[in-house]
Curated annotation (Swiss-Prot):
Keywords: Ribonucleoprotein, Ribosomal protein, RNA-binding, rRNA-binding. It comes from the Bacteria. PROSITE patterns: RIBOSOMAL_S8. GO terms for cellular component: cytosolic small ribosomal subunit. Belongs to the universal ribosomal protein uS8 family. GO terms for biological process: translation. One of the primary rRNA binding proteins, it binds directly to 16S rRNA central domain where it helps coordinate assembly of the platform of the 30S subunit. GO terms for molecular function: rRNA binding; structural constituent of ribosome. It comes from Thermotoga maritima (strain ATCC 43589 / DSM 3109 / JCM 10099 / NBRC 100826 / MSB8). This is Small ribosomal subunit protein uS8. Disulfide bonds: none annotated. NCBIfam families: PRK00136.1 (NF001109).
Length: 134
């Protein structure tokens, strides 16, 4: 049985977002922390924090919504895992994808760390496409 911790993280965020949860808890790892940092910096989540539990730790991701209580609107409209264990997707610096014509982001792991598509283009590096968020 294969397990994909990044796909699990994205699914937890997607499911909590669909039912307007305030936050969701995710088993922590360094890669997941970096992905959360990008999501926060790009304005897709309100915040996240690391909670020590004596094991690997937990990331509590606080989701972000627009509008008031009655007419709330999701900030994350879609979040999709691109490269997975059965099919790795690598791109070079000239073929970094644009998500929704620049309205979304692609998250990449590169030799310079975890970056958005825009940052990777500026640094001139390619890498593995982890996810699309819009």
């Amino acid at each position: 049985m294969w397990s994909d911790p990044i796909a699990d993280m994205l699914t937890r965020i997607r499911n909590a977002n669909m039912v307007f949860k305030e936050y969701t808890d995710i088993p922590a790892s360094n890669l997941k922390k970096k992905i959360c940092e990008i999501l926060k910096r790009e304005g897709f989540i309100a915040d996240y924090k690391y909670i020590e539990d004596g094991k690997q730790g937990i990331l509590r991701v606080y989701l972000k919504y627009k509008g008031g209580r009655k007419n709330r609107e999701r900030v994350i409209h879609g979040i999709v895992r691109v490269s997975h264990a059965g099919r790795r997707i690598y791109v070079d610096k000239d073929h970094i994808p644009k998500v929704k014509n620049g309205l979304g982001i692609a998250i990449l792991t590169t030799s310079k760390g975890v970056l958005t598509d825009k940052e990777a283009r500026q640094l001139g590096v390619g890498g593995e496409v982890i996810a699309y968020v819009w």
